[in-house]
Amino acid sequence: AASDVYKRQGVVAFELSTGDIHIFESRAVTFATGGFGRIFKVSSNAHSLTGDGPGILYQKGIPLEDMEFYQFHPTGIYRLGILLSEAARGEGGILRNKDGERFMERYAPSIKDLAPRDMVSRAIATEISQGNGAGPDSDYVYLDLTHLGAETIKKKLPDITDFVRTYVKIEPINEPIPVQPTA
C-alpha cells in the first residue's frame, strides 16, 4: 500500500546541545530509561529515579520486560533508605525477628545470615508478612551486633556505628539495629 512507503522504525532524537534532530532506523529499539527505585516506599535511590520512562512506555502499550528483577538490599536502616554494609553480617551480625529469634536458620540453614541479598530480603519480607516484624507497625527486623563486642564493632564496623548513632540514635554495641529491605 502507498502508506507503507512512508513507514519507518527506529528513534527520532533531539540533540540538546545543538538543537539538531537525528533519525536512527532500526528493526528493534531498547529503552534504557534509568532507575525507578523511588516507586518503593523505602529506597536508597536518587529522588529523580521515579520510573517516568517505564511509566510512559507502559501507558503507550509498549511491553516492559523483567520488571520483577529489582534488587533489594536486605539491611537498610528502617525508614531511611540508608544501606548498612553487608560487612555487618560478614563479621557475624545476626538478623532477629520481634521475638529475638535468629530466623535465617529457617530460610538458609547452612549459610544463615550470610545468604545472598535476594534470599535475605525475601526472608525478611516473609517474617514481616507473617507478623514477626518488630516495632509498632511490625514492619522491620533487627540486625544484632551486640554479641560481637565493643572492640570488634568499633574496629571493623565504624561506618555502621556512625550511621546508626547519627540517624537512629541507637548504640549498636548495646542495642540491635532496626532494618528492612531497601530498594
Predicted features, each with a name:
Residues 1-6:
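Short, small-residue-biased leader/transition segments that mark boundaries at the very start
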Residues 28, 32-37:
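Glycine-/small-residue-rich beta->alpha transition segments that form the dinucleotide
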Residues 14-16, 96:
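A generic structural motif
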Residues 56, 62-179:
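An anion/pyrophosphate-binding glycine-rich loop and adjacent beta-alpha core
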Residues 39-56, 60:
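A conserved FAD-binding loop/helix module that cradles the flavin
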Residues 19, 36-38, 71:
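Glycine-rich nucleotide phosphate-binding loop and flanking beta-alpha elements
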Residues 19-28:
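Core beta-strand elements of the Rossmann-like FAD/NAD(P) dinucleotide-binding domain
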